Amino acid sequence: ARRQRQMCIRDRSERGITGDVADEIYTKMRAFANYGFPESHSVSFAYLVYASAWIKYHEPAAFCAALLNAQPMGFWSPHTLVRDARRHGVTVRGVDLGVSVQGATLEDGGSVIRLGFTSVRGLGSDLAEQIVEQRQHSMFDSLEDLVRRVPGITVAHLEALATAGAFEECLGLNR
């Protein structure tokens, strides 16, 4: 702090500002530095909290879907986010080979969340993209069809999809 004061006083003197005026400028700058930085950040943070709370209250499904699509965030796990959404009345549907896309989406007019392929551990966005792309040509009619049309899909990927329940609706296969 002493060195910063000396630099500030020296800079002021180079501009013709000396004595009590230079001291007063330094004192005010230091006071603002101790207050202004945290104050501005707390205002920004308060605004984000307010906006987030408003969205979560009025659009809980959209709020949760957006947080799921922003993973990894480092604050809450996807499981925690889904559990909280359900506790607030949001219906959350699992991954479905026939309808899911890469990320979480809204269904039924925005009141329901459909989990995306990125919620399947170990699947990866490239493989998820391939699944969606192949499904646009035609629906998968079996696991063999999925394996044939999506190069690079492994037994581990199939097991992860099965564990997530992705084959239940589309192929009639349960976990």
Predicted regions and their residues:
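Noncatalytic, beta-rich nucleic-acid-contacting surfaces in large DNA/RNA-processing enzymes
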Residues: R3-Q6, R10-R175
